Every structure is written in C-alpha cells, then in structure tokens.
Amino acid sequence: MSDKKYNVDEGEIAKFSRIADKWWDKSGEFKTLHDINPLRLDYIDGHADLCGKRVLDVGCGGGILAESMARRGAAFVKGIDMAEQSLETARLHAALNNVADIEYECIRVEDLAEAEPHSFDVVTCMEMMEHVPDPAAIVRACANLVKPDGMVFFSTINKNPKSYLHLIVAAEYLLKFVPKGTHDWKKFIAPAELARMCRQAGLDVADTKGMTYHVLSQTYALCDSTDVNYMFACRPAF
C-alpha cells in the first residue's frame, strides 16, 4: 500500500461515496448527523469562539459541520475528506447557498499536517475516527495542524456493550436510523484510549462531554455519561 493510501479504508470510502448525494437530506441516511449538528456546533463555538477563526474540519463528508461553522462566523473553513463524491456535494451545496470563505480538498489529514503545520485556530474531527484503521495517526495529525493557542475537537463512539446495542442493534437494525453497516463496533474507541492518544500527540483534554438522544424530540443534549457518543475539547500541551 502506498503512503497516499495509508490510513484510508477503501471500503469506508466506497460506502459513503454510494450515498454522497444524500448528505443534505435531513430525513435520509444522514439524519442523525443533522440532528447532532446543532449540539456539536454550540459545543465547539462555546469553547473556541469560531468568529474570525481559521478552521479545519477533518472528515467533513458533505459539509454539514463545515458549512455551519462558516455560517457561525469563522473567517475561513477548510473541509477535507477522502471521498471525492462527498466533497462535490459539499462544494455544490455551499455554492447554491452562497456560503463564502469555505473550501474543500480531497487530501489525507496526515499529508495536510506536513504541508500546513500549525496553521489553524480550530481543528475538528467529528464522527470520523471510528471509520479509519489508525485513529492515533489522525490525532497526531490534528495536533500538528492546530496553532499553539488553538483547540482541537474530537467526537466518536465508546466501545462497550451499550454502544453496540444502541448504535448497531437499535440504530441500524431495529429503528433503521442509519444504513446497516454504517458502524463497525471493533473500531469504536473508549474515552480512556482516546485520551491516551491525545496525551501521546501532545494534547491536553480540557473537557469531556457525552451526548444523549431524545427520541420524541429527535434532538441531542450534552450529558456527563460517555457510555455511547462523546466529545473531547483539547488544547496543545505546553
């Protein structure tokens, strides 16, 4: 495998490419991401104050979070992903909705970290690490891309029986919130493991929050439990 393909799961790329035209369908395959986006946007903005910042969204997909951060007042947003079809959807949606100061590129985060080290005020990597072979490499690259006084945000899924029941058995098979095969439980990451990756990459975890889903209102809320979905807010260690 060439360096350009390292840490790229071709099966994951193909999976998301097949449904790339569905990214902005709020009742379709990506409904869960649309439901969770207001919460994660407020969490990021509350810690980092997006207004006037240079922001990188790693694993941006069709641009749901990237575009919302641009609308929130970021001076510049760059979204990167390895699924070109998803990026085409993101570019088209931004253009049709007159969202300025946003660009998308098909590039590995590891390569961008080599080309543009310490160049972003805010780096986000949300609901992405459970789809790659080497999440620790993603964490290291994010740490290398953020400015010394910036912030890095991660969100992913805990690895335990509860997350398996909630996000695979219930979400994929019973309630059909997401397509079958969206998640691979073996790739889920426990908070302690992600914290270890952050420390080894030179990041301090400043805050940890869980996310809980309210079925009736179809909204997410912050909570103290990290049993299923959770987020980290990190700062470069000094």
From Swiss-Prot:
InterPro entries: SAM-dependent_MTases_sf, UbiG_MeTrfase
Pfam families with a match to the protein in the record: Methyltransf_23
Enzyme Commission code: 2.1.1.222, 2.1.1.64
Pathway note: Cofactor biosynthesis; ubiquinone biosynthesis
Annotated positions binding S-adenosyl-L-methionine: R40, G59, D81, M126
Enzymatic reactions: a 3-demethylubiquinol + S-adenosyl-L-methionine = a ubiquinol + S-adenosyl-L-homocysteine + H(+); a 3-(all-trans-polyprenyl)benzene-1,2-diol + S-adenosyl-L-methionine = a 2-methoxy-6-(all-trans-polyprenyl)phenol + S-adenosyl-L-homocysteine + H(+)
Sequence similarity: Belongs to the methyltransferase superfamily. UbiG/COQ3 family.
PANTHER family assigned to the protein according to its UniProt record, in alphabetical order: METHYLTRANSFERASE, UBIQUINONE BIOSYNTHESIS O-METHYLTRANSFERASE, MITOCHONDRIAL
Name of the protein in its database record: Ubiquinone biosynthesis O-methyltransferase
Native source organism of the sequence: Neisseria meningitidis serogroup B (strain ATCC BAA-335 / MC58)
